[in-house]
Amino acid sequence: MSDQTFKQSMDLFHKTIAKYFPDRILELDILVAICASFFIRDISQPMALFLLGNPSSGKSTLLEIIKELPVILWRDNLTSAALLSASPNIAPEDQLLHQLEGKVLTIPEFAPLANNAQAKQIMPDFTRLLDGNAFVRHTGNGVIGTTEAQRFNMLGAMVRVSPKLWELVGNMGPRLVFIKLPDRQQSLDQTVTRLTKLSSKRSYTEKLEVARKIVLAFYENIAKYYPDGVTWNKEADDKDTIQKIAKLAVLVT
């Protein structure tokens, strides 16, 4: 490892991201933090966060930037059978349930699940998993699944939560957190100026590739700085901060 400190590594990460995606640094910080949360010991509760935003708001770009991280488990479509199947022809390791441990399940287009015929089965399944509970099914071939809770996180993106989708996810309560990406507030002249500069700068694909590399390098640095993980010192917790966190928890429940 170089003599670069963790703070210097973080500063370089922010500086590079600010160069190419200056209006999405905070949201990217949150996504990387969710991916890096596995380094913190004694966390057993899964986290689920969804990005909301209009087309071209950057939600898909944010997920694409972190796509190459080793903890990302990317899925474009989900079915109840894909999560856990009773078919004897499908090995346990090929089923999503047995791939979740230590991963961030990432669903870039979550809204289509609302139109999935099996959605009413999938959502209760994930409610149980996000509760940190074991997951088993009783079938004609016996009991399948796992008796151990899966430690995983979940990310997704959608334009908005439709009434139909809200009906499905509403019972999941505080297990889900939503971040609304603000629209770019630019005048016509500012928009024209931004668009005309695109031809003289790196292409979107090039910027995305640079961002992916810097995020991966930063994530790998976290692993180097904390090879044994991070043990939370609860005795050093600030009471005021704990109270603020508790108030926020009440707010989102």
What are these regions (language model features)?
Residues 137, 145-150, 166-253:
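Phosphate-sensing "switch" segment of ASCE/P-loop ATPases
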Residues 38-39, 120-144:
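Conserved catalytic/switch belt of AAA+ P-loop NTPases
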Residues 29-42:
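Pre-Walker A adenine-sensing motif
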Residues 101-130, 163-173, 188-189:
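Conserved AAA+/SF3 P-loop NTPase catalytic/coupling segment centered on the Walker-B
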Residues 41-62:
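Walker A/P-loop nucleotide-binding motif
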Residues 1-27:
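Charged, amphipathic alpha-helical linker segments immediately N-terminal to NTP-binding catalytic cores
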Residues 52-57, 65-105, 111-116:
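AAA+/P-loop NTPase substrate/partner-engagement loops
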Residues 108-111, 139-142, 151-162, 181-184:
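A short beta-strand-to-loop transition that corresponds to the Sensor-1 phosphate-sensing loop
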